[in-house]
Amino acid sequence: MGKYILSVTLLLLVGGSVAAQETNTVSTRFGALTVDEAGVLLFKSAPFKPTIEANNSLDLGKPFEIGAADVVLVTDNGGTSCPALYYFVTVTKSGAKVSPAFGSCSDLITVKRNGESISVSMPGYQGPSESKRAQLRAARETHVFIYHAGVVTENGKPVK
C-alpha cells in the first residue's frame, strides 16, 4: 500500500512539472510559432532578432491567411502599469518578421479583418498610479492600429 501511494505521488509530481513547462504554439502554412518556457517567441525553434520576450506571458492568436502570408497577432501580457502590448508576426515561405510593439497598454481589444488588412481597436489606458481623471479620459479615447502589407500604422503613420 505504501508503494502504491508513493507511486501515485511521484506520478502527480512528474505530471505537474510537465504541465508547468508547456509551450504555446500556433501552426502556420510555413512553420510553427512557439513561446518557449522562458517566454521567448520562436519561429521554427529559433528566436527572433531582436528577441521578443514576454513581460509576464505571450499569447499567440489564430493566423490570418492574407495572400502569400500568414499573420499572427501576439499579445505581450504585462502588469498593472501596462497590461498588454501587441506585435504582428508576418510569416511567409522566406521566413518570419515581427512588427514593432504597438498598443495603448489596454488589454481590451477588438480585432477585425478588412480584406487584406487587420484592424486592432482599443481604448486608451492610464495605469493605477495616474489620477482617476486621467484614467477616465484615457478610457474614452479609441486607438485603431491597422496592419497592411507588413506595416502597422496608427492614424496613417507607421508605428516605430
Predicted regions and their residues:
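His-enriched metal-coordination microenvironments in redox/metal-binding proteins
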Residues: 77-83, 103-105
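Short, surface-exposed beta-strand/strand-loop-strand elements in extracellular ectodomains
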Residues: 85-92
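Bacterial N-terminal signal peptides that target proteins for export
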Residues: 1-6
